[in-house]
Amino acid sequence: MSEAKRRAAEKAIEYVENDMIIGVGTGSTVAYFIDALGRTPKRIKGAVSSSEQSTAHLKQHGIEVLELNHTGTLPLYVDGADECDPYKRLIKGGGASLTREKIIAEASKQFICIIDPNKQVATLGKFPLPIEVIPMARSLVARQIMARTDGQPVWREGVITDNGNVILDVHHLCITDPVKLEQELNQIPGVVCVGLFARRCADLVIIGSEPPHIL
C-alpha cells in the first residue's frame, strides 16, 4: 500500500509549478508528497502547512513554511483523505488536522486529493467521521449527534488538535447526502469543524493504482 501512496504523491508533483506557494495537508500519503517536493528540481516559493507535523517535515527539506494570512489565495492544495466517493467528496480528519485542512482547501484555487485505491468507496461513512469540538461542548455535541443521526460518536481520548480542541469520531454512518449532513452538523454549538469535504470537495483525485488513475 505504501507504493500506491508513493505513486499518487509523485503524480501530484506534475501539477506543481516553479514559484508557486502551495498548500500541503497532513498524513502518510502527504508525507510521500513532501519527500517528492524535496527531490523535485522545481522550486516553489514556499508552502502553507495544515499541521505541526507537516510543518516539521517541510522544514526538514528546506521548504519555507508561510502563514496563510500573508499569502492570499493559493494556486494549489495537495492532501490525502480517509474516504473518497465517486463525486470527489471526502471524509478527512483521521490525523486530527481537519480544521486547518478545510481552511486551506477553501483558500485554494485547485484542491488535489491523493489516495491509495482502498480509500475509494461508493458511499461515505464506513470510516468514522471526525468532528473537531470545543472541549467543554464534547458531551453536548455527542448528544446532539445521536439525536440528529444514526451515528455513534466516540471521543478520541488523548488526542488534542493543534487548535487545542478534541475529536469525536462518529461511527456507523451511511452518508447519502454529504452536503446536507455537513451543514447540519456544523450548526451544532461547539462544533469547530466537520470532517466532511462535500461542499468544498476535491477538484481532482489521484489514485495511486498502477499506473495512477485520475478521478
UniProtKB/Swiss-Prot annotation:
It holds the Pfam family Rib_5-P_isom_A. CDD domains: RPI_A. Substrate binds at T26, G27, S28, T29, D79, G80, A81, D82, K92, G93, G94, G95, K119. Its EC number is 5.3.1.6. Keywords: Isomerase. It is an enzyme of class 5 (isomerase). HAMAP family: Rib_5P_isom_A (MF_00170). This is Ribose-5-phosphate isomerase A. It comes from Xylella fastidiosa (strain M12). The gene is rpiA.
